[in-house]
Structures are given as C-alpha cells and as structure tokens.
C-alpha cells in the first residue's frame, strides 16, 4: 500500500547479483562464440593441410538454391553465401500456391535485409522489437493487471525483478518512440565497436541500476514512490559509453553527425537538465534514472571496461584447459 515503507536492502542485493550475473553470462557466451570461431578456423586449416577440405556448406547452399521451386521464384542470378538465408528462401518458395509470387518475393527481400544486418544490428533491433511487443501487451485490457504486477516497478511492492522488466514498458507512444530512437542511435554505434553480448550486459545493467536509484529516491522522499517504467536509464548508460568512445576515437560513424567535441556537450546538457529536475524535485520524469545512467556509462567506459576483457579471456582460458584435458 502507499502508506507502507519502501525497503531498499533486497533491491540493492538483487541489482548487484543481476549485474554480476549478466556480465558473467554475457562474457561466457561471447567467449563461446570466439572459441567456436577459432575451432572452425583450426579445422579449416587442418583440412586444407591434409588436402581433404570440401566446402560442404557451399554445396548445401547450391543444392537448395538450385532446386526448381527456388529457381522459378528468384531466378538463376540470385546468389547468397548464407545457409540460413538459403533455407529461409526455400521455405518461402514452398509455401502454398494461393500466396502470390509477388508476396513471396517481398518476403524474400525482407529475409535478405535481415541477413544483411550485422550481429550487433540484429541485437539492437531485437531489443527494440521486444519493447514494441511489451508496449502492445500493455494495450490489451485484460492483460493490464498482469502487466502492472510484472512490468511496472512499484516501490511499495517489495519486488526487485521489476527493476529489469519495467525497462521494456513505456507509458505512451511518444515515450516509446523517443526511447527507441535513442536506443537505435546509441546501440548501433556501441555494437560497431563492442560485441553484442557486451552491449546487452551494459544496457541491462545500466537500466537496472538506474531504476534502483529511483527506488532509493522513493525511500528517501515518499512523494516519489510511484510506478516506474521506461528504457531511458539504459539508454543514458549507452549515451555515456558513446561519449567516452567519441572522446577517444573521434567520429565513430560517417553517417552520425556528432563529433568528439559535440557528443560530450550533448550529454552534459542533458545531465544538467536532470540535475535541475532533481534539485526542484520535479515529478513525472525519471531525472534520477537519467543522471545515474549517464554517470554509469561514462564511468564504466572510462575506468572499468577492462573488466569485460578479463572476463572473456578467463572463460576462453577455461575452454582451452578443457580441450587440453580432453
């Protein structure tokens, strides 16, 4: 109830455990992927050295793309080097005849666009899609009680996991649009220079800790003990990371107009406005979450990003030891 005290201890423990866990799991997955690449390269080199190398993947793709059904739809000029894309095209080509060829070709173009994305871009777009899906679920009247229980962080509830799930909820279409626009802009830049697993760990951790900061504010000032939602804490964390990367490397992307001089100014102006909102105790906007996310992003990218490399290397070393033991 609104008159109940807002407890903090469990939320702090949960946020610390989540941040540690998401970084360890993400680093482990990244190490698995890197080690898989190394194993494939090793096998390829060994096969070529023995003179037994065959491009089985290429042959599989040629068989799929050379089938009469696929050729009738895409023509002989269509080429792909991706097995997953070839399988998707084959599936589309074999859909029922009542689906027009134009519709099938449109679906194939969409598949081509998806496979043309980098792993980082797919990760960012997947995160945006998840936010849109959750926003849609909020619009289903019969789901409102469930969404309010599990996708809105309410300080009086005593729940901690909603500090994570509330990141994917948004109050209005405008709220969703601007947060997703910012997530797209910063996410694409970040995933250009760090693995997508690292991006996920940074984004989710910044969002959870930013929500924790709002939770602590509500414990100190009961007037702020209202429901929290939104991705802005995580987005501000990415903005902080991008600011440091800009300061180090200059322009990260030719298509992105900000420079190493203007990016820090943009973040400082945003954070200064958040400080004003906090000082005047304005409500309705998560100023504390914004400020916390920005500070976390800058601090992490400037001083603690080496922790990620150490985690990944430690997991890769375990892989190597396991291989030697076997």
Describe the residue ranges of each PLM region.
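A detector for small-residue-rich transmembrane helices and their helix-helix packing motifs
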Residues: 2-326
């Amino acid at each position: 109830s609104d008159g109940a005290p807002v407890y903090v201890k469990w939320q702090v423990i949960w946020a610390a455990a989540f941040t540690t866990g998401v970084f360890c799991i993400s680093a482990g997955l990244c190490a698995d992927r890197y080690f898989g690449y190394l194993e494939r390269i090793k096998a390829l080199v060994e096969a070529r050295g023995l003179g037994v190398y065959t491009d089985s993947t290429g042959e599989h793709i040629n068989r799929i793309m050379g089938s009469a059904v696929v050729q009738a739809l895409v023509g002989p000029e269509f080429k792909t080097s991706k097995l997953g894309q070839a399988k998707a095209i084959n599936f589309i080509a074999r859909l029922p005849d009542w689906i027009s060829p134009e519709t099938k070709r449109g679906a194939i173009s969409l598949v081509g666009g998806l496979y043309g994305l980098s792993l980082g871009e797919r990760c960012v777009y997947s995160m945006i899609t998840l936010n849109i899906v959750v926003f849609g679920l909020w619009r289903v009247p019969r789901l409102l009680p469930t969404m309010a229980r599990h996708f809105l962080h309410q300080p009086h509830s005593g729940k901690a996991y909603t500090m994570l799930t509330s990141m994917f909820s948004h109050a209005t279409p405008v709220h969703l649009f601007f947060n997703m626009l910012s997530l797209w802009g910063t996410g694409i830049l970040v995933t250009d220079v760090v693995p997508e697993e690292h991006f996920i760990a940074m984004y989710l951790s910044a969002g959870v800790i930013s929500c924790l900061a709002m939770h602590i504010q509500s414990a100190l000032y009961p007037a702020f003990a209202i429901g929290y939602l939104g991705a802005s804490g995580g987005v501000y964390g990415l903005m902080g990371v991008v600011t440091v990367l800009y300061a180090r490397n200059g322009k990260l992307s030719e298509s992105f107009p900000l420079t190493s001089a203007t990016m820090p100014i943009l973040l400082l102006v945003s954070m200064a406005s958040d400080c004003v909102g906090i000082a005047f105790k304005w409500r309705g906007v998560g100023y504390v979450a914004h400020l916390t996310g920005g500070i976390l992003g800058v601090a992490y990218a400037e001083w603690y990003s080496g922790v990620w490399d150490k985690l990944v290397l430690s997991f890769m070393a375990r892989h190597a030891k396991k291989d030697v033991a076997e």
